[in-house]
Amino acid sequence: MSEKVTRRLVARGRVQGVWFREGMRQEAARLGITGWVRNRMDGSVEALVQGSADSVEAMVAWARRGPEAAHVASLEVTDASGDYFSFEKRHTE
């Protein structure tokens, strides 16, 4: 079994009101990713993603593109920690 990696993502640009969180939830289910995603008051979307290195890399690639209606101007990716068993959409913070 491969070791889990965890990354914190912050997407900026046109990322709210374009189904970014729901798209990420669906992509997480497809990739076997756990963690969470939420809108932030500053207009960005923040996520914490955990899974195999390949799955997390694929999720980061998806987040750089986002759903069709999104325009991701920048994506900040940093190491994170925690242990997650599902993927959830959280409330705006």
Show where each model-derived region lies.
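Intrinsically disordered, low-complexity, mixed-charge
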Residues: 1-93
